[in-house]
């Protein structure tokens, strides 16, 4: 049975809105209340996305207390040509350089392949940890669409009808995005 309240730890308002949409889509009865805690968690510097999310979730549990169902979500953007980098470091790339400069990193290479990956780490009311992951393959393109949500305007998913995430309607994006896929798995677990 799904818990009645789950705490999502994030300080990212766009991410929070998207997660609210993703959870509400399945929860027709309103049986789960999503609470937000914008805790400032340390981020493990690693290329192992599951380890990063799990470490953040353990920190959140330490701050909020065992017994509170809590989850964190970490997103990565990996370039095939760079053997998985920038990966989880994409957040720092975005803070230090423009989207245009990120695209230029791949300019010398013909392979513009990329993967968008979301990893969810969840701790249930019994203190047990669970990991869920969603991956969407795509490519890096020149920026198209609004630039107000991370790197959405430079990632074009293979099954995205030639559009970047930023050019898509939210409902369509959520059916094929890395975050949408991760939340499908998370919701299956919650409602099992």
From Swiss-Prot:
Pfam families cross-referenced by the UniProt entry: Ham1p_like
EC number, as in UniProt: 3.6.1.66
Presence of the UniProt keyword Nucleus in the record: yes
Assembly, per entry: Homodimer.
GO molecular function, one term: dATP diphosphatase activity
Catalysed reaction equations from the record: ITP + H2O = IMP + diphosphate + H(+); dITP + H2O = dIMP + diphosphate + H(+); XTP + H2O = XMP + diphosphate + H(+)
CDD domains to which the protein is assigned, alphabetical: HAM1
Record's function text: Pyrophosphatase that hydrolyzes non-canonical purine nucleotides such as inosine triphosphate (ITP), deoxyinosine triphosphate (dITP) or xanthosine 5'-triphosphate (XTP) to their respective monophosphate derivatives. The enzyme does not distinguish between the deoxy- and ribose forms. Probably excludes non-canonical purines from RNA and DNA precursor pools, thus preventing their incorporation into RNA and DNA and avoiding chromosomal lesions.
Family according to the record: Belongs to the HAM1 NTPase family.
Native species: Candida glabrata (strain ATCC 2001 / BCRC 20586 / JCM 3761 / NBRC 0622 / NRRL Y-65 / CBS 138) (Yeast)
GO CC entries: cytoplasm; nucleus
Binding-site residues, Mg(2+): 43
Any one Gene Ontology BP term: nucleotide metabolic process
Keywords: Cytoplasm, Hydrolase, Magnesium, Manganese, Metal-binding, Nucleotide metabolism, Nucleotide-binding, Nucleus
Subcellular location: Cytoplasm; Nucleus
Name by which UniProt lists this protein: Inosine triphosphate pyrophosphatase
Cross-referenced InterPro entries: ITPase (IPR027502), ITPase-like_fam (IPR029001), RdgB/HAM1 (IPR002637)
Highest taxon of the lineage: Eukaryota
């Amino acid at each position: 049975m799904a818990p009645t309240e789950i705490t999502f730890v994030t300080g990212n308002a766009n991410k929070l809105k998207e997660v609210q949409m993703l959870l509400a889509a399945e929860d027709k009865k309103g049986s789960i209340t999503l609470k937000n805690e914008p805790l400032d968690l340390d981020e493990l510097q690693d290329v192992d996305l599951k380890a990063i999310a799990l470490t953040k979730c353990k920190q959140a549990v330490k701050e909020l207390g065992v017994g509170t169902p809590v989850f964190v979500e970490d997103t990565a953007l990996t370039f095939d040509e760079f053997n998985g980098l920038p990966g989880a470091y994409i957040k720092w790339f975005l803070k230090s350089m423009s989207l245009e400069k990120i695209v230029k990193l791949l300019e010398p290479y013909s392979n513009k392949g990329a993967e968008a990956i979301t990893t969810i780490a969840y701790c249930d009311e019994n203190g047990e940890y669970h990991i869920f992951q969603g991956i969407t393959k795509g490519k890096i393109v020149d920026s198209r669409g609004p630039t107000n949500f991370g790197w959405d305007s430079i990632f074009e998913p293979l099954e995205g009808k030639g559009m970047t995430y930023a050019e898509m309607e939210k409902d369509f994006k959520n059916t094929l995005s890395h975050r949408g896929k991760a939340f499908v798995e998370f919701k299956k677990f919650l409602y099992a």
